[in-house]
Amino acid sequence: MDFIKRTFPMLFGIFLLSVLVRLPQLNRPLSKHHEFCTAISLRVMQIWYDNGIENYGYNPVMTFNTPADKFINNSANQSGRMIDKQGNYYYVSHPPFAYYFPFFFFKLLHIRPDVLPLQILNMLFHFISGLFVYFTVCLLSFNRARSLPYRSAVVAFAIYMFMPVTLWFQGNVYMSDMAVHLLFIIGVYTALKMIIRRRFYSPKYIFFYCLTLALMIYTSWLGVFFAFGVLVYSLLHVRGELKGFRVLIWSTLIILLVMLRLIVYQYSQINGVSAYVEEMMGRYIIRGSLEETDQGLWHFMFSYLWLVKTLIYNYVMHYIVIYAAIGAFMWLAISRKKLKIVFSENGYRFIWLSVMPVVLLHVFFLNYSVQDFSALYASLFFSVLAGILYDKVKKSGAIPIRTMQVSLVAVLLLMVAQYELMNMPNAFSKQQQKLMGEKIQNSAGADEVIFSSYELLEPQAIFYAHRNVKYAKDKAEAIEFLKATNRTKGVFLELRDNKEYVKVVERFSIDSINQQ
């Protein structure tokens, strides 16, 4: 009852402050800093909502339902083979659960998927993630989460709430990459609690762990690396004093194999197993760690090191304030004898479960990891570490409590300032992609296939246009596409970089061309 009456209101109040910080960024046109992810997610969900998810085999479709939009691949898949007989393209780089939950949640509430509802849901995920950060610190500190507020856990929660990486990617940006983060945090907490509290044989904990792992794998590939991390740790300790790791091993193996089989089966229904395998191999070449191996060893090594540099840069940019705070703690530990850096066995367990899957993801998917949203996954480790270090300093008495409180407020304010600097308005209009999309929509009839020689059309513009746009270098190529797909009318548009410029160059039809 203490948690409901005192702790929860306090934590929710801190969360509301984080929402207040983000208010200027909410419910505006999608425009920047990976908001193309939100545009892709909403395109999938809106097509399902308008036309019925069952008509697409419950798969993430990227083709609008207008007949003129069929057979057009806009940011859908690499190989071009993930297409059904009706001409619908599908996005299969990730499993589909990240789209399912918001879609069915909005469907239940009779809300059409759109920017603000999805942002609100994403911030709710942010709050739930923070709660499990709080629970994790309580678990590691042997404090009951259901009792009075535990100060160090509150610190970890507050740090997590105001990290620039969580403020943005659990607010404005939503896709599988962000949705899996909540499940990852819950998974780490559940596995850690099974080990620390020795709940290996508890049906409740086994069920909750298996459910979390299954949904994690069904959301994004971080779930696979988490499963691998749990397996390796369990195998290393299966013959130790702590019995029960065989339960974790078999539970993890069964869930991993079942979910991978389900994903392959589901996506193979679109256009066969070979098409799906080809698509995933192509995606791995692009997003994995082996791109440009055909260019020679030295070229590959230079490219690899450049990607590592970018990854390090992303971590510095998102966690520089946290690094400074940890650096201050290290200085205190070195300069004052009564403050020692000692981690318990449970601390090392947490480090393994929270860090190993992220490291594996970066190693095997380096090209993917240089997208800075992958730095989100480290927020669990850094926020819990901040809470534990705060607890160590407080117990040592090396710094007065008042000074620690002022320092915490300073850290939070610095992180908010960093968030504002990273996401401040740039030279491009926030309305740009929306205006371009609306002009594209108004420039073509429902029976006209839209063509353009512009190669850099963003997913945001496609989302606001509610139309697919086919790339063609000229009119002749456009006419060839019309004939190949049995369509008769087309319109060629001129689009320009960084402007809301949309101009109708020419309208044409197969019938009029045949008559000439």
Question: What does each model-found stretch correspond to?
Answer:
Residues 235, 313-345, 356-359, 386, ...:
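Hydrophobic, aromatic-rich transmembrane alpha-helices
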Residues 190-198, 209, 213, 225-256, ...:
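Perimembrane helix-loop-helix junctions
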Residues 19-24, 163, 223, 389-392, ...:
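Transmembrane alpha-helical segments
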Residues 223, 229, 246-327, 358-361:
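Membrane-lumen/periplasm interface segments of specific transmembrane helices
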Residues 14, 154-160, 208-211, 249-253, ...:
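Transmembrane alpha-helix segments characteristic
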Residues 170, 177-185, 225, 349-353, ...:
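Hydrophobic/aromatic-rich transmembrane helices and adjacent perimembrane loops
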Residues 227-228, 426-430, 442-476, 480, ...:
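Short periplasmic/luminal acceptor-recognition loop of GT-C membrane glycosyltransferases, typified by
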Residues 33, 38-117, 285-294:
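Interfacial juxtamembrane loops and adjacent helix segments
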